[in-house]
């Protein structure tokens, strides 16, 4: 069993789920012992000990409200520094408690509401994932007597505004953020959490019976896929830079048909076997386009211009002037399909490459 003291720890952070578990524990402890805690020590589901600071706590009658400030460590995200408020009401079992459990967990203002199938939580329920629920229940039950029960209400001030900057609206989670976290720990400087937040898009698409999924890098692809392909929101999967991760997930979930669609600046990299398209990982756009242009022309001056270009848009203009734009990008599109088909066997791929305005530069379908 490991122990992380977040009063001292600056590298690791703690999840929204850990905030909710810590806040609910401190509130119930206050109700039971009439003592305010500046921090609590709770267990995650692996048995690790997490020491989490409590920002504020108040009590009135059989109800206490605890506030925990979300801390993301070095892996700063949109939720870092936000307050999570947990209201705990303590009652006897013969009052308004469920017979099946002595811990009832509900969502308040700023916690999202599920509207689409395919996620870990069913439609009509608050966006509080199963693992955080289990962590809350496990820690509270250590304080409860057999004849006692609690209602835990989780709220996030400004959660609805914060959620607009996340994938929640696309996933059909409306009105607030999600309470997440398997271990309760946010690992530093990794993309793991963000990658995992992208994967549920595939579940939503499959739950809505889409057979062909459209994988796009981001907003530009999403916007133009709706126009050019008449695609529906839930059919479009935003992968960010993580093509390898998302295609692994797609194969794992049984997806058979994928259209790769998006701006040339990102899609071209796939032709070179670059499946994490972030610029800090690799670029090579100019080199890749130069190689495929050389199959259409041996004009050395054109090839040199391409290598020295600052943007993909500049290269597009060069190819238009030379009259070989479509030829080059159709070759690139074909190579994208070949690359992906070799790595992710069993999936039928097609590829459409566009510019910023949504004009099709090349395709292989």
Curated annotation (Swiss-Prot):
State the UniProt keywords alphabetically: Cobalamin biosynthesis, Methyltransferase, S-adenosyl-L-methionine, Transferase
- InterPro entries named among the record's database cross-references: CbiD, CbiD_sf
One Pfam short name: CbiD
The record's GO molecular-function terms, alphabetically, read:
cobalt-precorrin-5B C1-methyltransferase activity
In this entry, which stretches build a coiled coil? Answer: none
Query: Which pathway or pathways does this protein act in?
Result: Cofactor biosynthesis; adenosylcobalamin biosynthesis; cob(II)yrinate a,c-diamide from sirohydrochlorin (anaerobic route): step 6/10
* Record keyword Cytoplasm present: no
Q: What is its EC number?
A: 2.1.1.195
Q: What is catalyzed by this enzyme?
A: Co-precorrin-5B + S-adenosyl-L-methionine = Co-precorrin-6A + S-adenosyl-L-homocysteine
What GO terms describe the biological role, i.e. biological process, of this protein?
Answer: anaerobic cobalamin biosynthetic process; methylation
Instruction: Name the domain of life.
Output: Archaea
Q: Which family does it belong to?
A: Belongs to the CbiD family.
Q: Which NCBIfam families match?
A: cbiD
What is the name of this protein? Cobalt-precorrin-5B C(1)-methyltransferase
């Amino acid at each position: 069993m490991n122990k992380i003291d977040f009063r001292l720890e600056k590298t690791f952070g703690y999840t929204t789920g850990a905030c909710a578990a810590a806040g609910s524990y401190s509130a119930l402890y206050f109700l039971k012992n009439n003592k305010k805690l500046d921090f609590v020590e709770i267990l995650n589901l692996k048995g690790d000990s997490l020491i989490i600071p409590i920002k504020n706590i108040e009590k009135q009658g059989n109800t206490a409200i605890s506030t925990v400030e979300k801390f993301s460590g070095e892996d700063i995200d949109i939720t870092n520094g936000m307050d999570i408020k947990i209201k705990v009401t303590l009652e006897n079992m013969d009052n308004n408690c469920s017979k099946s459990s002595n811990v009832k967990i509900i969502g308040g203002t700023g916690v999202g509401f599920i509207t689409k199938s395919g996620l870990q939580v069913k439609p009509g329920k608050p966006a509080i994932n199963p693992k955080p629920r289990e962590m809350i229940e496990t820690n509270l039950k250590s304080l409860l007597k057999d004849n006692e029960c609690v209602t835990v209400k989780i709220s996030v001030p400004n959660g609805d505004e914060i959620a607009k900057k996340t994938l929640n609206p696309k996933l059909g989670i409306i009105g607030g953020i999600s309470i997440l976290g398997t271990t309760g720990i946010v690992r530093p400087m990794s993309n793991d959490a963000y990658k995992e937040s992208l994967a549920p898009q595939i579940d939503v698409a499959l739950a809505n019976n889409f057979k062909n999924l459209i994988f796009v890098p981001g907003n530009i692809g999403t916007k133009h896929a709706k126009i050019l392909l008449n695609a529906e929101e839930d059919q479009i999967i935003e992968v960010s830079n993580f093509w390898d991760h998302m295609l692994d997930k797609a194969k794992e979930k049984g997806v058979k048909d994928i259209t790769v669609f998006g701006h040339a600046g990102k899609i071209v990299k796939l032709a070179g076997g670059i499946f994490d398209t972030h610029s800090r990982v690799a670029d090579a756009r100019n080199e890749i386009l130069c190689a495929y242009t050389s199959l259409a022309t041996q004009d050395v001056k054109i090839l040199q211009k391409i290598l020295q270009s600052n943007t993909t848009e500049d290269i597009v203009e060069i190819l238009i002037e030379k009259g070989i734009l479509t030829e080059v990008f159709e070759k690139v599109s074909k190579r994208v399909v070949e690359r992906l088909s070799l790595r992710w066997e069993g999936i039928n791929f097609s590829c459409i490459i566009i510019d910023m305005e949504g004009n099709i530069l090349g395709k292989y379908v």
